[in-house]
Amino acid sequence: MLVRAAFALLALLASTSIARAQSGEITVMAYAGIFQDKYTEAVIKPFMAKFPAVKVNYFSSGNSAQMLGTLRTQRSSPQVDVAILDVSVSNVGNKEGIFAKLDPAKVPSLKELHPMAIVPDGFGPAVTFDHWVLVYDTEKVKPAPTGLADLWDPRLKGQIGLSAMPNIQGIAATVLASKLAGEDFKTSIDGAIKRLKDLGPSVQTFDPQPDGYTLILGNTLTVASGWNARAQLYHDDSKGRLGVVFPKEGSVFQINTINHVAGSKNAEAATAFIEYALGREAQKRFTETMFYAPTNAKAEISPAAINRTAASAENMAKMIPLDWDWVTTIRDSWNNRWRREVIAGR
């Protein structure tokens, strides 16, 4: 009798938890623009169709640093339940107690993630992988560039947009320039800074606004740095005028993590959303919509889509490992060298 009663109580508690997860309102904070449009269509709307009693509000922000600033100001009374932002910034939030650890029992998709998607100590894992690329005007740049080394071609002088630090694209450019210089960026970037300083006079802008893709299509630049996912969309929208190059020197991952805000008002629904976003279905849909590489290793992505991401076998073999937690320890130093020696030195 007591055993039956105990099982009945457990069943009631489980059903109550599921009901909470399937009702209420949550706010997801993530990037503005194309990301918001595509993520809403590929992930948020299908989630709400699956859980019709849950309303998901999308709060857009320009970049990860702004998101962290917003969460800091709301710390005593969080208005956001889930935040998607760059891992180098979310790691800071983890250390400050802004984000809560996830319960693996409530997020079973954690078991299906790529090892590199796992964030230490149980915090929010990677939900997307992107990577650094070069983009160019296929009508004006012939032959097409094949890597970072081609930016020193005199033909491109005054036509280049290279996003500098503190933009994390600048970190990626530093790592690749170090490889060109034959040095290990973990011990020295002297060679990289020298190469980038030499490139300086050829760079029209170190801060492409609104971005390099738009400036190329608007005939202001012919070559720029960028991120693959957005570049692939602009490639399609421009009917191939914007070319996308995976650099022959390799590339580095840009990682977005999905995080449960500590003290959020609807923790159960927030956890349910995180589980859905990491699941095979949502990962497949978003990869095939916007060409971010999936973090769920069991998501079955179409070959046509996967070959346009860093997750293809050929591209994965050329990726350069980068510990973004380590990056936080050298970021200010690298930024100062860019500012003093590369940007001011041209």
Question: Language-model segments: which ranges?
Answer:
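Sec/Tat signal peptide C-region and signal peptidase I cleavage site
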Residues: 17-21
